Amino acid sequence: MAKKKNPQVFMDVSIDGDPAETMVFELFPEVAPKTSENFRALCTGEKGIGPRSGKPLHYKGSFFHRIMKGSSAQAGDFVNRNGTAGESIYAGKFPDESPKLRHEETGLLSMSIADRDKFGSHFHITFRPNQQLDRNNVVFGKLIQGKEILKKIERVGDEEGKPTVSVKIIRCGEYSGDKKKSDGKKNGKHKKSLRVRRKKRRRHSSSESESSSDSETDSSESDSESDSDLSSPSFLSSSSHERQKKRKRSSKKDKHRRSKQRDKRHEKKRSMRDKRPKRKSRRSPDSLEDSNSGSEASLSDVNVEIGAKKRKHRVSRRTGNSAPAVEKEAESLHQGKRKGPDLLENRGLRSNGISDAASEQISDRQPDIVDDHPSKSRSRSLSPKRTVSKSTSVSPRRSQSKSPSSSPRWNGGRSPAKGSRQVKNLTNSRRESPGSEEKGRHVRRSPTKSVSRSPVRVKKERDISRSPSKSLSRSPLRSPKRVISRSPVRGRIARSPSRSPVRSASRGSLGRGPLRRSSRRSPSRSPVRSSRRSLSRSPIQLSRRSLSRSPTRLSRRSLSRSPIRSPRKSVSRSPVRSSRKSVSRSPVRSSRRRISRSPVRSSRKSVSRSPIRLSRRSISRSPIRLSRRSISRSPVRGRRRISRSPVPARRRSVRPRSPPPDRRRSLSRSASPNGRIRRGRGFSQRFSYARRYRTSPSPDRSPYRFSDRSDRDRFRSRRRFSPSRFRSPLRGRTPPRYRRRSRSVSPGLCYRNRRYSRSPIRSRSPPYRKRRSPSASHSLSPSRSRSRSKSYSKSPIGTGKARSVSRSPSKARSPSKSDSTSSDNSPGGKKGLVAYD
C-alpha cells in the first residue's frame, strides 16, 4: 500500500565505534518529491561526484554533526563532515518545496528550506515533536525501523548540539528485499570462513600460550602444566575438525547413522570435560586458591566452549573468533598458576594491561562470550558487566587481605553471579597471599572500597574498568589516600559524575572512603560520605567543577576545595560557612559540613547554599535550590555581602533598614503573619511587603530606591486611610498600637494596609533606624540584614517560612549574632536580604 509504494532507505549508524545498527526510513515523495529524491539518491550514491564539491554525492562515511538533546539530530555533510558544507543532487539549485507536514512525531526526516541551496544534503531527524521546525523545514520521510538507535544517538548529544562521541553513517542505500538477500549471502560466506579462521586462531592462541608459559616464573611446573593445558585445546581443535568432516560424510548417510554419530560426539565432549577438570586439580593441589580457581576455570572453560559452539556464527562475526575461548582457557590456567606468586611478587599490581585493553575493546561486543573467572581478574573484565568483576578481581589481587573483604562485598552486590565465585577467590587469595599484606597500609584505604565505588561507575564500561584496575592497583601502592586521588582515570573522567564516583572510588572516597581518610574529618558528619565522599557527591553535582579536578590535585583536600581545606572552616569563606555550622550544612554532604558543595559551586554563593545546608539549616536545604539565586546569594554574601549574613547584616544593618521596623512591625502584627500562614502564604508579615514587590523586576528597588514618602505617594489611593499609621512608628506609639491591632485586627484590610504601610516603613529607613535601637534587642541588625524581606520574599517564597526560619537561626546563630538568634522572625528577613544583594 502506501508504505510499499514509498521508497525506503537504510542507514547503518555506528556510535563511538560500536557495531553499526540499522535505521530504515520511509520517504514521502508525494509530499516532497524533490527533497525525497535528493535524500534517496544521496543514500545510494548513484549520482557520482558532486560538481561543486568534487566529493561523491553519498552519505556514506559522514557524521551526525549536531545532536540537540530533546530536539533533533542533524547530519548530511559529506563534504567537510562537520556541518559546514553540503551539496544536493541539484547542483546548488534546489527546487523550492513548501512544508506540508508538521513535526508531530519522533523520527521524522526533514530538511531546512532556507539553506537547501548551500547545504542541500543536510537533514534533520526529530527526537520529539518539534513545532519550531514546522515553518523552516520540509518533512519528507520518517523513521520506521531503528528507534532504539535513535534514542542512543540522542543520549550522546547535549543541549548545545555537540555530540559527545562520534556518530557515523557507515553504510546507506535503498532498502529492499535485495539488501536482505545480500546480507544472507554474506552470512553464508561468513560461516564458511569461520572454520578457516578458527584454525588460524587456534594456532595463534596455542603459540601465544606457549610463549607465555615459557615466561612463567615457575619454569618447570608452569611449562609442564602449560604444555598439558595446550594439549587440551589442540586436542579440541583437532577433534572439532574431525567432527566437521564426519558431519560432511554423515550428511550423505541415513538419519539413523547421523544420530549415532551425534551421540558419539556428545560422549566425547563429556569425556573431555571430565578430563580437563582432573588435569587442573592435579596441577594445583598446592594452594586452595589455585584449586578453586582451576575448578572454576575449568567449568567456565566448558561453558565457554559450549557457548562458542552455540554462538559460533555470531561470535565469529563480532569478535572474529571463538578461539578466544580456547585462548582464555590457556590464559586462565596460566593465570591460575601464577596468581599466587604474582600477588606476592607484584603486590597485586599486575593487572595485565594488554588483556585489560583488549577486554575493554571487546567488552562492548562480546559480553556473552566471556564467563566470569574470578581467578583471571583481567580476562574477565571483558564485558562491561565484568568490568566490575575485573576491577574486583584486581582489587583482591592488589590488596589481597585488606581489600578482599570489602571487595567481595561490592563484588557480590555488583554481580551476584560473579559475586559468589569472586568472593571465594578473594577469600582464597586472602589466605594465599598474607605476604602481600605489605599492602596493609593500603588496607586502610581499602582499595576494595574504591572498587566498590568504581563498579558503580562501571557503567562507564571502558573508563571505569580502566579506572578500577589502573587506579586501584596503582593507588594501593601509592598511598592509601593519595593514590586514588590520582586516579588518572578519574582525571580523565573527571568530568562526568560517574567519573567523580570513580574518583571517589579509587580514593576510597566511596562511602567508605571516609573510613580511611574521612576518619579524621568526615567522621564528624557522615563518615561514610566523608569529606571526600561528600566531595564526590559534590563533584557529581558539579561534575564540571570537577571536584574530581580538585580532588585530583589534593587527595584529601581537593575534594571540595573549600570543605576539604577546612572541613569545618571551609565555611569560613562565606558567613554560612564561617559559622562552621553552615558549613556543616554543606557538609551534610561532606564530612563536616564541608559546604563542600557550596564552596565548590561558588565559594560565595555556595555559602548561601551552605547555610541552607547548615546542619541546622538543613531545612534551609530547600533553599539550596534557591540558594544559588536569592537565598544562596544572600547567605554567601551574607558575610561578605551583608546581604544576609548576620554579621554583615549587623554591619550593614542600614541596608536592612526597613527590615528592622518590618520585623518589629511584623512581629507586632503577628496576627498578620499568622493570618498569612493561615491564608496559605507561607510567610510571616515580614515578607508580606516582599511578596508584594516580588512581582516588580527588582525587589531591591522598592526598599532602597523609594523613600517612605514616595512609596506613600505611590500607593496613596490605597493607603489613604492608613497614613497615620505610617506616622505612628515615628511617634513611638507604633509598637503597642500595632501589637494591639495585630491581635485584634483580622488579616483582612489591616493586613493589606499593613502590608503596604510596611513597605513604606521599610523604605523609611529613618523611622526604622530610630526604632532600631530598641529593636536591636530584637536583633534588628540580623533581622534587618535578613529583614530584607525583599530578597527574602524572593527566595522565601520558594522556600517557605520554615526555610527562612531555619536559615536565620542557623545563620544568625552560627554567626553568633545574638540578634540573629533573638530574631527568629528575622530569619525570614534574612532570607529576603539575601535575595537583595
From Swiss-Prot:
Residues 229-239, 380-409, 466-478, 494-513, 536-553, 774-784, 792-827 have a biased composition (Low complexity). Its main location: nucleus. Residues 290-301, 352-361 have a biased composition (Polar residues). It is found in: Nucleus. Expressed in leaves, flowers, roots and stems. It catalyses: [protein]-peptidylproline (omega=180) = [protein]-peptidylproline (omega=0). Residues 176-837 are annotated as: Disordered. Belongs to the cyclophilin-type PPIase family. Interacts with SCL28, SCL30, SR34, RNU1 and SNRNP35. This is Peptidyl-prolyl cis-trans isomerase CYP95.
